[in-house]
């Protein structure tokens, strides 16, 4: 049975675990009305529309 000969240091252990942590790029879509970039499933901050309806006042 495989047993480690030496103890793995915390730095080596943490570096190995951190290799799997990758940030994903933010998904951005264009607003159909004003063509500004907007996060999906959120009202457009520039024109205030969501799913073709006016939700908030335009800023």
UniProtKB/Swiss-Prot annotation:
Keywords (A to Z) from UniProt: Ribonucleoprotein, Ribosomal protein
Keyword Ribonucleoprotein applies: yes
Stretches assigned to coiled coil: none
Domain of life assignment: Bacteria
GO cellular component assignments: large ribosomal subunit
Single biological process term from Gene Ontology: translation
Molecular function terms, GO-annotated: structural constituent of ribosome
Family: Belongs to the bacterial ribosomal protein bL32 family.
PANTHER family with a match to the protein in the record: 50S RIBOSOMAL PROTEIN L32, LARGE RIBOSOMAL SUBUNIT PROTEIN BL32
Protein name: Large ribosomal subunit protein bL32
Lineage: Bacteria, Pseudomonadati, Myxococcota, Myxococcia, Myxococcales
